[in-house]
From Swiss-Prot:
Gene: groEL
Keyword Nucleotide-binding: yes
Keywords: ATP-binding, Chaperone, Cytoplasm, Isomerase, Nucleotide-binding
Record localization: Cytoplasm
Coiled coil regions in record: none
Record-given protein name: Chaperonin GroEL
């Protein structure tokens, strides 16, 4: 078994703080509208330029194992905040550093770390309560544009793009970010329900110029069976022919004589039809087919439901205004399902979303939700070089997360003002002893640090700016981009409440751990064995 290194007391805490400071000092130069960028070396390809706290933190590993533990703890603050709120990682890192430094002075002076920790927790709880009171809901497209622009490093073009996308697909819609071949960033909208399966035969095309099959007012047969014998679908084909409407078949597969019959009838002008494979795999496929059935007001025909294809009647088929398919994709537009059924299905998927721990499942459920709720918007990111493209894509993804957080819990004044406005609420906290009061004071002194840093990065004296803001009321604060004092809501300088709240909660959680640490144990690095010289040649 490998030997271990052990460090205790002050020595342990000093090493932890040194590692923590290394990461925090690198991250904090990016805070605010005039924050700088950090360039990250990549083993392969061009370096990455970013001002995103979590991306920078994740790249840092230190040689000293004890210092590296401190660095890893800060990474945890940043990545946890990123997971919960999608932004605010730099603020979280800066707050963690401030809380640790303030707290360490008192712990070294003899305060009981466990009581200090309890004081910090009480103070954070009070601040979060106060933030929720200050927060106001996101109501207008303009609010969304402001939140997105600030998160994307004050890029108004990105802000407007995300506001436009959210306006089009609604709050439950899915917005995806993809790389574009050109140099401009554009927004594309996919209306209706789209899935990645195209027509099974090119003979089904109705628009040769665009290589698309477009069917107006079709009946839709939805099944998870493989259809190869024409006898299985003949009864329903005859019923649909009598209505004079086209037929869309969504099945595991349509092959052999069944497919041939559909093609021949299409060519002869007897029945316009379209066959596509069912989307997804396994249980996810069944869930998606049920979604389509609910959206179109049809029934999902399956062995499990006990309905045979031969017994399918017209009222079991779905309806839609239009179905469009090319070789890769099928889109169902204007499904004629019952609104209440669709809403119940949406509520069911939302419930599953709350309960799942898997990131992959969450993504897939979110996609299904969007397809039922109103569509998908795709932001295609363009840039002149690959380095710029990656940096821009990263900013858009950040802005998107922040915007979703803002919609969830509302917005608070940005630029560090919201945290300062909660300071007065700390006067009301009841503490059990002096050390708990110290914990509350530590939080009080740390709450103005983000604002000071924003001002410092803008070339101003942070302490002076912070004092001026404390003398003001409500949403009044400092606009570092234009060097003026303004109403933050009116100027559009806002942060999602969820981002500010998560940043403080995660910072306090790690700071409390560091303050109550007395010992560190790490692997002893093995000395590299010298390779023996090669044998002499004879």
């Amino acid at each position: 078994m490998a030997a271990k290194l052990v460090s205790l007391d002050m020595q342990a805490r000093t090493a932890l703080i040194k590692g923590l400071d290394t990461v925090a000092d690198t991250v904090k130069i990016t805070l605010g509208p005039k924050g700088r960028n950090v360039v990250l070396e990549k083993k392969f390809g061009a370096p990455v330029i970013t001002n995103d706290g979590v991306t920078i933190a994740k790249e840092i590993d230190l040689e000293d194992p004890f210092e590296n533990m401190g660095a890893q703890l800060v990474k945890e603050v940043a990545s946890k905040t990123n997971d919960v709120a999608g932004d605010g990682t730099t603020t979280a890192t800066v707050l963690a550093q401030a809380l640790v430094h303030e707290g360490m002075k008192h712990v070294v002076a003899g305060a009981n770390p466990m009581y200090v920790k309890r004081g910090i927790e009480k103070a954070v709880e009070k601040v979060v309560e106060e933030l929720k009171k200050i927060a106001k809901p996101v109501e207008t497209k303009q609010d969304i544009a402001h939140v997105a622009a600030i998160s994307a490093n004050n890029d108004e073009e990105i802000g407007n793009l995300i506001a436009e996308a959210m306006d089009k697909v609604g709050k439950d819609g899915v917005i995806t970010v993809e790389e574009s071949q050109g140099i401009t960033t554009t927004l594309e909208l996919v209306e209706g329900m789209q899935f990645d399966r195209g027509y099974l035969s090119a003979y089904m095309i109705t628009d040769p110029e665009r290589m698309e099959a477009v069917l107006e007012e079709p009946y839709i047969l939805i099944t998870d069976k493989k259809i190869s014998a024409v006898s299985e679908i003949l009864p329903i084909l005859e019923r649909v022919v009598q209505t004079g409407k086209p037929l869309v078949i969504i099945a595991e597969d349509v092959e052999g004589e069944a497919l041939a019959t559909l093609v021949v009838n299409k060519l002869r002008g007897v029945l316009q039809s379209l066959a596509v494979k069912a989307p997804g795999f396994g249980d996810r496929r069944k869930a998606m087919l049920q979604d389509i059935a609910i959206l179109t007001g049809g029934q999902f025909i399956s062995e499990e439901t006990g309905i045979k294809l031969e017994n399918v009647t017209l009222d079991m088929l779905g309806r839609a205004e239009k179905v469009r398919a090319n070789k890769d994709k099928t889109t169902i537009i204007g499904g004629k399902g019952n609104k209440k059924d669709i809403e119940a299905r949406i509520a069911q998927i939302k419930k599953q979303l709350e309960e799942t721990d898997s990131e992959f499942d969450r993504e897939k459920l979110q996609e299904r939700l969007a397809k039922l709720a109103g569509g998908v918007a795709v932001i295609k990111v363009g840039a002149a070089t690959e380095v710029e493209l990656k940096e821009k894509k990263h900013r858009i993804e950040d802005a998107l997360s922040a915007t979703k957080a803002a919609v969830e819990e509302g917005i608070v004044p940005g630029g560090g003002v919201a945290l300062i406005r909660t300071i007065k609420a700390l006067d009301d906290i009841k503490v059990d002893n002096e050390d708990e009061r110290i914990g509350v004071e530590i939080v009080r002194r740390s709450l103005d640090v983000p604002l000071k840093l924003i001002a410092n990065n803008a070339g101003k004296e942070g302490s002076i700016i912070a004092e001026k803001v404390k003398e003001m009321d409500g949403p009044m604060g400092y606009d570092a981009a234009r060097d003026r004092f303004v109403n933050m809501f009116d100027a559009g300088i806002v942060d999602p409440c969820k981002v500010t709240r998560s940043a403080l909660q995660n910072a306090a959680s790690i700071a409390a751990l560091v303050l109550t640490t007395e010992g560190l144990v790490a692997e002893k690095p093995e000395k590299e064995k010298q390779t023996p010289p090669p044998p002499p040649e004879y």
